[in-house]
């Protein structure tokens, strides 16, 4: 559900180490540090830089029904009043005469934004090739934030639009998240979806550069956007 999960989920929690070490001598402290390093390595050793096809497409085995145009959706089960009202509510003010015959939906991700209390929103425009150059953004360790997606849907209803995000640090996969965004009908106005609040990890193991892959897919496992990018976590936010 996030760009990068909290410290405990990723094995980057320094606070417990500090509490355990405060009464120990230097030798015990070094031993515990080495043990923590080994534990972190074991925790992440089974992950690789490239996620497997099974991990990336673990929903691909779902057996889905036939796809319909919007006009066909409206005609189907038209005698069922509850279904008819639900479809009308879902479609809203869609001009069926213009797009009702198009089978495949089109989803365009316009931008991603990182919203953090007391900070201006970090608005990330998506390059056409889906691969931002250099470091795409910087996060402060231990900071709370929400992700916000702005996107357009055209042509037809998109069912089960979802977001996946995989994160690597020094070539080792440290996090993978999925979030169901929902089902959306085509409309002229953009959709905005805000993710639940998350907290960036903190501590010296958490700071540094990361690489990540974000995807937006639907129930048919059709990928509308894949973004491969880099970001980093620092002690402080970059200067405005």
Swiss-Prot record:
Regulates the GDP/GTP exchange reaction of the Rho proteins by inhibiting the dissociation of GDP from them, and the subsequent binding of GTP to them. SUPFAM superfamilies: E set domains. PANTHER family: RHO GDP-DISSOCIATION INHIBITOR (PTHR10980), RHO GDP-DISSOCIATION INHIBITOR 1 (PTHR10980:SF63). The gene is GDI1. Pfam families: Rho_GDI (PF02115). Residues 1-66 are annotated as: Disordered. Belongs to the Rho GDI family. GO terms for biological process: cell tip growth; Rho protein signal transduction; root epidermal cell differentiation. GO terms for cellular component: cytoplasm. This is Rho GDP-dissociation inhibitor 1. Interacts with RAC-like GTP binding proteins ARAC5/ROP4 and ARAC3/ROP6. The lineage of its organism: Eukaryota, Viridiplantae, Streptophyta, Embryophyta, Tracheophyta. GO terms for molecular function: GTPase activator activity; Rho GDP-dissociation inhibitor activity. It is found in: Cytoplasm. InterPro entries: Ig_E-set, Rho_GDI, RhoGDI_dom_sf. Keywords: Cytoplasm, GTPase activation.
